[in-house]
Amino acid sequence: MDERIISSETVDAEEVSFETSLRPQTLSQYIGQDKVKNNLTVFIEAATLRNEALDHVLLYGPPGLGKTTLAMVIASEMGSQIKTTSGPAIERPGDLATILTSLEPGDVLFIDEIHRLSRAIEEILYPAMEDYCLDIVIGTGPTARSVRLDLPPFTLIGATTRAGLLSAPLRDRFGVIDHLEFYTEEQLTEIVLRTAGILDTKIDDLGAREIARRSRGTPRIANRLLKRVRDFAQVRGNGTVTEKLAKEALTLLQVDPRGLDTIDQKLLHTIIQSFRGGPVGLDTIAASIGEERETIEDMQEPYLLQIGFLQRTPRGRIATETAYNHLGISYEKEV
């Protein structure tokens, strides 16, 4: 699959480094997610006053909304060190045991894609999260024995795009569960202006708003689009990102005014033209457009549902009248 400029996943190590350079250090610097921030401010202050570790935190929502950044900010606000890993990287119980025994009092352990932990790994986490202890087995066969090791108080922050895949026992052990929502156009405009300042890029308010409008409610996409539009401003303009230049650049990048690219349009056209608007099953859509089912579920569908272009029903996906209008296709409602 070709790289999508509006993909909400990080595409390479360079982009990871770029995102790291943009990250805020405090909750006051973190733009958006106000409900989540307000609650976390109280929880962090209360834990600090009691000289306790913050309750374990689960952050869930579509990719690119700032779950990793928020984990870093929480650690910073707590004055704690943070150790990061991911579900796929923890393959064996020994991998997790090594990480847990290296923690210092008050540390934050961040596990991205926590829904991809195996059940065997999850079972090691249960006593670690509840009682700050680690049960390990020494030896094999008849001589094997279980030894319990004490762990220092720590905070586990888990991030996932698919909270429904977490087992109930693991999910129930998180004291704080927060859903990150898509960002408003105003919030994304503020993010674009902030990033432009860090990049020393000249941009006016209307130029920033045009980029924000096409960023699918996602800061990661907004920052990526800004970098590409900046290139057009330097090569084809006078170095300043204006509304006119942003529109021209984003049109050339095949990102339409609602943030849809050719893959999104292909998905909607397929539902409308090949399946009479639906309902049609996700596996059928995936096979028709040559995408993985999981890619559609995680990367395309959440935004299309958010803006009202798709409906999800027990019988399958349906393209809405709004989607027809956006694509310039006549909508005939079935009687």
Swiss-Prot record:
Molecular function terms in GO for this entry? ATP binding; ATP hydrolysis activity; four-way junction DNA binding; four-way junction helicase activity
Where on the tree of life does the source sit, at the highest rank?
Bacteria
| Lyase found in the keyword field | no
- Residues binding ATP are L22, R23, G64, K67, T68, T69, E130, D131, Y132, R173, Y183, R220
Record's keyword terms, sorted: ATP-binding, Cytoplasm, DNA damage, DNA recombination, DNA repair, DNA-binding, Hydrolase, Nucleotide-binding
CDD domains (UniProt xref): AAA (cd00009)
Residues covered by region (Head domain (RuvB-H)): 257-335
Q: Which InterPro entries is this protein grouped with?
A: AAA+_ATPase, AAA_lid_4, DNA_helicase_Holl-junc_RuvB, P-loop_NTPase, RuvB-like_N, RuvB_C, WH-like_DNA-bd_sf, WH_DNA-bd_sf
Question: Has keyword Transport?
Answer: no
Spans annotated as Large ATPase domain (RuvB-L)? 1-183
Question: Catalyses which reaction?
Answer: ATP + H2O = ADP + phosphate + H(+)
User: Which cell locations does it reside in?
Assistant: Cytoplasm
How is the quaternary structure described? Homohexamer. Forms an RuvA(8)-RuvB(12)-Holliday junction (HJ) complex. HJ DNA is sandwiched between 2 RuvA tetramers; dsDNA enters through RuvA and exits via RuvB. An RuvB hexamer assembles on each DNA strand where it exits the tetramer. Each RuvB hexamer is contacted by two RuvA subunits (via domain III) on 2 adjacent RuvB subunits; this complex drives branch migration. In the full resolvosome a probable DNA-RuvA(4)-RuvB(12)-RuvC(2) complex forms which resolves the HJ.
Anything noted about its domains?
Answer: Has 3 domains, the large (RuvB-L) and small ATPase (RuvB-S) domains and the C-terminal head (RuvB-H) domain. The head domain binds DNA, while the ATPase domains jointly bind ATP, ADP or are empty depending on the state of the subunit in the translocation cycle. During a single DNA translocation step the structure of each domain remains the same, but their relative positions change.
Q: What is this protein called?
A: Holliday junction branch migration complex subunit RuvB
Which lineage ranks, top first, belong to the organism behind this chain? Bacteria, Bacillati, Bacillota, Bacilli, Bacillales
